[in-house]
Amino acid sequence: TVGVIAMILASVKPKEKLILQRNSHRSAIAGLVLGQIEPIFIQSNFNSELGIFTGITPDDLLKCIMKNPDAKAVLLTSPNYYGMATDLDGLIKVARDHKLTVLVDEAHGVHFHFNPYLPKSAVDLRADMVVQSIHKTLPSFTQTSILHLNEDKIEKERIQTLLAYLQTSSPSYLFMMSIDAVRSYMAIKGKEIIDREIEIANFARAEIKKFKYIKSFNKNDIIGKDGVFDFDPTKLTITTKYAGYSGFEVESILNSKFNIEIELSDMNNILCFITAGSSTEDIKKLTSALTYFDENKKIMDNEFEIELPNIPPLKMLPTLTFSKTPELIPFSESAGAISYDVICPYPPGIPLL
């Protein structure tokens, strides 16, 4: 969160424009508020079958830049929570051609650098600044993250000053040791660890393929569609809607009936992470529990098609909104009003409103 805010404040001055995906993390909204910055949102592509926002394409970005030639920077999010990665190389080239500073929220991709079977890391693709949440996919303490700088373009001193303003002046040495320990761990054993994770994930997909109604997509099912350029196979998305269950229902039943805790649920899916701590025994326990849903198919009570609204026009800078005195009104009466704050389900931490 602090890394995203610092990237934004280091790249864009008050009242200047930042191009960003509409499915950016809520920390990006905080950066807009603190920096008095005008957002130019790009609607991400959407996989309607899964009900998942994916990402943007180089062509999407180019069209936006053509309409906003005075934008100063672009904030890209790749991969998304589900491991779907955009064409970062192409996006970076488009941004560079138009002299935009390239910021990447790679919160879920810190492990990409360590294995050739994963998408390319934004760090290796030389984005100007990249923030990664180490704790999301690697064995480090919660809150541990890292901000990478391309020092050919970014003043390190300015970032250091911003970080001093934004975060604690008494950092935890336990957290810092955790970062260094996992860095060493991955430098020595990273490829081997991720090879094993991918093997376990593939085993899980093979087991799920035996079901009639419970499904799990693989690389070939999604690459080249809806803006997806590459995929992290260690993210195991299990689609439950064909069995008549929402992901929310499945998460609740897995927890209460089978003592299984998953990462995330949505209307159509549940999401599991395969990490260094995962085992084939974990997968066997999970797939055994999923048998319950496959064998007890039902008609989903609230099945519906999502109709995506257009991004509404910006009536007021987020900074000005935040400076107003809010009024609490019923949701049913809120059409046409300006939202004072974000409404943000977590995970994944993407503002709904």
Regions found by a protein language model. Give the residues of each.
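Conserved C-terminal alpha-helix-loop-beta "cap" of PLP-dependent enzymes
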Residues: 203-353
